[in-house]
Amino acid sequence: MQFKEVKAKSVEELHKLVNDLKAELWTLEFRNSTGSLEQTHKIPQLRKDIARALTALKQKEMETK
């Protein structure tokens, strides 16, 4: 996910995106711990996507203040 795509979303969409990504990360980490996850490279990608979304969210919140 590119930062441009994330930055274009509204605050509500960013909150939903962060929650969805965190839920997906939890699922992948659980599957990884049980040994059933084959694509382990997705975990760091999701962490970076969450960081991008949180950064964009913080920027939007700072703009409105």
From Swiss-Prot:
Enumerate the SUPFAM superfamilies for this protein: Ribosomal protein L29 (L29p)
Q: Show the GO MF annotations.
A: structural constituent of ribosome
Q: Which UniProt keywords apply?
A: Ribonucleoprotein, Ribosomal protein
Task: Note the CDD domains from the entry.
Answer: Ribosomal_L29_HIP
Specify whether S-adenosyl-L-methionine is a keyword of the entry. no
Extract the InterPro entries matched here.
Answer: Ribosomal_protein_uL29 (IPR050063), Ribosomal_uL29 (IPR001854), Ribosomal_uL29_sf (IPR036049)
Q: Report whether Transmembrane shows up as a keyword of the record.
A: no
Q: Name one GO biological process term.
A: translation
What GO CC annotations are associated with the protein?
cytosolic large ribosomal subunit
Annotated Gene3D superfamilies: 1.10.287.310
> Of which family is this protein a member?
Belongs to the universal ribosomal protein uL29 family.
Name under which the protein is recorded: Large ribosomal subunit protein uL29
